């Protein structure tokens, strides 16, 4: 059995968990998240904990149990604390600003880029070179941050581009004559 799946997911006070067949719904102060759990995994709900048991006779049940536990744990953390992703814009003239739920980016192209944030993700720009994204859904916020970063990934010679705030960009040395 997966080591990750052996640990139960603790349900803190103020979080409501509903299990309807294989559909798990987690509700908390930051919203409500739902996820379909793989058929190879059996979910047991106690008073304040969820346990994930792989079904016997299914090939990848152990792996699916560990994955399901990790995803549900992220859901519980998301509805209680939420997730934050910070992006930095490095480069001359690179700017960002929020217009409602649209991030307007100026990244050195001939046109401005407008990225609409999906429902469930909020954004703010504390400065012109910073973007802070917040959401209860870990997968969604990671995808939105990756989409924004993909407009101008950090290049390896000067390090210009959109990067995560904790990302370390390894720069190369320029070609010598």
Curated annotation (Swiss-Prot):
Q: Which GO terms describe its cellular component?
A: cytosolic large ribosomal subunit
Q: Name one GO molecular function term.
A: rRNA binding
Q: Which organism is it from?
A: Actinobacillus pleuropneumoniae serotype 5b (strain L20)
* Gene3D superfamilies found in the cross-reference section: Ribosomal protein L6, alpha-beta domain (3.90.930.12)
Listed under subunit, the entry gives: Part of the 50S ribosomal subunit.
Check the UniProt entry and state the signal peptide residues, or none.
none
Name of the protein in question? Large ribosomal subunit protein uL6
Entries under Pfam families matching the protein: Ribosomal_L6
Biological process terms from the Gene Ontology for this record are: cytoplasmic translation
By sequence similarity, the record places it as follows:
Belongs to the universal ribosomal protein uL6 family.
Protein keywords: Ribonucleoprotein, Ribosomal protein, RNA-binding, rRNA-binding
What is this protein's function? This protein binds to the 23S rRNA, and is important in its secondary structure. It is located near the subunit interface in the base of the L7/L12 stalk, and near the tRNA binding site of the peptidyltransferase center.
| Lineage: superkingdom | Bacteria
- UniProt lists the gene as rplF
């Amino acid at each position: 059995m997966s080591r990750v799946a052996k640990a139960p997911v603790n349900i803190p006070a103020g979080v409501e968990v509903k299990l309807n067949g294989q559909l798990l719904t987690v509700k908390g102060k930051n919203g409500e998240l739902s996820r379909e759990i793989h058929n190879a995994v059996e979910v047991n709900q106690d008073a304040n904990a969820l346990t994930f048991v792989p079904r016997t006779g299914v090939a990848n049940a152990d792996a699916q149990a560990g994955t399901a536990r990790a995803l549900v744990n992220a859901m519980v953390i998301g509805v209680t604390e939420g997730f934050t992703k910070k992006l930095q814009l490095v480069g001359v003239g690179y700017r960002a600003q929020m217009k409602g739920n649209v991030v307007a980016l100026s990244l050195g192209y001939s046109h401005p880029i407008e990225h609409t944030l999906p429902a469930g993700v909020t954004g703010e720009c504390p400065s012109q070179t910073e973007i802070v994204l917040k959401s209860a859904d870990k997968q969604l916020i990671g995808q939105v941050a990756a989409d924004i970063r993909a407009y101008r990934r950090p290049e390896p010679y000067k390090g210009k581009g959109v990067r995560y705030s904790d990302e370390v960009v390894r720069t190369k040395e320029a070609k010598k004559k």
